[in-house]
Amino acid sequence: MAQKKRKERRYVPYGVAHIHSTFNNTIITITDPNGAVLAWASGGFFFKGTRKGTPYAAQLASESVAKKVQQTYGMKEIDVFVKGPGPGRETAIRALQAVGLDVKSIKDVTPIPHNGCRPPKARRV
């Protein structure tokens, strides 16, 4: 049987963290500068149901992704792009800093319509 060629570890010292935060969940994706995904996690990795959308779930997801890219790719610096209005936005950024990644910039890329689609009707509770 042929020997498997061992995959060499790629060194990526700088990356981009994309934090997509909705009211129901928070998804953190870390990519290299070209946009190739290195690691990702979401609140649903750790909790199910309504607890996915909590800041604590976002913190756990952010910490796990940051540790993975530090150990696997030797990443030290990141830029952060935040999208969405959810409760996990700030917590996810703080968790990235707490793990030891150097956050160079934070940019809000939440899509804002210039009077596009009609919004859904208001809930009557």
Swiss-Prot record:
GO terms for cellular component: ribonucleoprotein complex; ribosome. GO terms for biological process: translation. PROSITE patterns: RIBOSOMAL_S11. Gene3D superfamilies: Ribosomal protein S11. GO terms for molecular function: rRNA binding; structural constituent of ribosome. Keywords: Ribonucleoprotein, Ribosomal protein, RNA-binding, rRNA-binding. The keyword RNA-binding applies. It comes from the Bacteria. Part of the 30S ribosomal subunit. Interacts with proteins S7 and S18. Binds to IF-3. Belongs to the universal ribosomal protein uS11 family. HAMAP family: Ribosomal_uS11. Located on the platform of the 30S subunit, it bridges several disparate RNA helices of the 16S rRNA. Forms part of the Shine-Dalgarno cleft in the 70S ribosome. This is Small ribosomal subunit protein uS11. It comes from Coprothermobacter proteolyticus (strain ATCC 35245 / DSM 5265 / OCM 4 / BT). The gene is rpsK.
